Amino acid sequence: MNQINALNQSEIRIDWSMSSPGLAPKSWRVFDSSETPANATRTRVEEELKWPAGTAAALNFAFENRLSRTTGWDLNALADTAALQMAAKIFRRGVVTSEESPRTVSGSYAITFSNHADPRSDLQAEAIHILDQSVQRLWGIKAREGDLVLQLSETEKTLETAAKIFAHIADTNKPIQIIGGGILADTAAFAVALAGRSFELIPTTLLAMADACVGGKTGVNFGKHGKNQLGLFAFPSRVIIHSAWLKTLPTREIKAGLAESYKHAVISRDKSFSRTLAELEPTAEAIKPWLHRIISVKAEIIQIDPNEAGLRAILNFGHTLAHALETISQTHNPSDPLLHGEAISIGMRFATYLSFTEGYLKASEHEHLQTELKSAKFMISNPEFHTHLGPVNNLWPQISACIFQDKKNVGSAKTTEWVLLKDFGEFVQTGSLYTVAVHEDHIKKSWETFAAQESLLQS
């Protein structure tokens, strides 16, 4: 954390260095010819992304066999490895294969806090703008020839959308700016990175400012296999922050961003900071003085651990359950699902409870966090939770199916990896990892007790 200048309110600079692919294999999966598609026909997405035929099938195979980020792919027995090599590059943001030795990559980028009177002044005239449609409409931004305007929800955060963006930028060498929220940033940055191009990010939501645009994670969802399962680590050339974008953001979206920001306050180990964010009014004016500090917390962690080999995992506090709830919500209520931050607010409460029931977090800290979270102005109410989750019966089997596809999982088929607390802002560490393997039976029991106590189960 030593390189981040927290006193410089106009810029945060992140210098990063990491291994690519990110994690050294703990085991190897030997592939043989019977497991690889023979004479595969290129799908439309494979054609648009210029991938070898069989890449999508290889990805499906890896997920169906529950391979993890720490499972290397041994391709030595295969004559044609092109499809598997491409799949390995983006599977859970990259895994090692027998044909590719990890290499060290490094770079630097600035998170700039713009002082322009109008945030639209940060849009470069010479750049291609990949632009959120709502932002375009609310701010009266005229799309020019070469720009791409998209309206994306989690449903459209797919390889198909990435392929559309990839094709759009294929024949130009102009600079690229991505202007919008986290879904657009994740998807467009993934497509641009696949094309080997650099990009600037201009986040227009609090969630994107605090999380999605800081850290280099890009990617898309992959159908039944879950949220953010395909992607690349690809760092922007610059991130431009302007709080004025938040003035047109719906209150619900601001609350969702504050939930993610609260997680950063917990990580900072500063109870006054967490209390401030819990009590903060969900307005652009109230948030503006705190933006630099909110973003600095994640920036410091990214610089230490850019590819989530260790410490960065704590940024996933609350995310294991949250991703499951999001997936379930998008299935049962696709027109108005839970927002990411809303799911995180519930996920943090459950992760805190699981930390307590697993014996890591003492009762007083558990009570403190639960009380603060439940009373926070950003916390989604139970009626809102039920509305956005959709008409779901027998919730646990669906949660279980989702969490066992989580990217953090590395071990037994009966355990999943969780980011748990041992004190306020202190996370349980096992060796170099900041995740804990919890048995399915423990998770089920804790969830059912927690959900009943908090009235999260629909009658």
Enumerate the predicted regions with their spans.
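ATP/NTP phosphate-donor binding region
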Residues: 4-16, 20-32, 37, 49-51, ...
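C-terminal charged capping/lid subdomain of soluble metabolic enzymes
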Residues: 14-16, 51, 62-65, 72-74, ...
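Glycine-rich beta-strand-to-loop/alpha-helix junction loops that act as flexible
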Residues: 152, 179-181, 317-318
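Structural motif
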Residues: 178-179, 202
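Short glycine/serine/threonine-rich phosphate/pyrophosphate-binding segments
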Residues: 183-190, 209, 324
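A glycine/threonine-rich phosphate-anchoring loop and its flanking beta-alpha core
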Residues: 190-280
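Active-site segments that bind and position negatively charged phosphate/pyrophosphate groups
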Residues: 275, 279-397
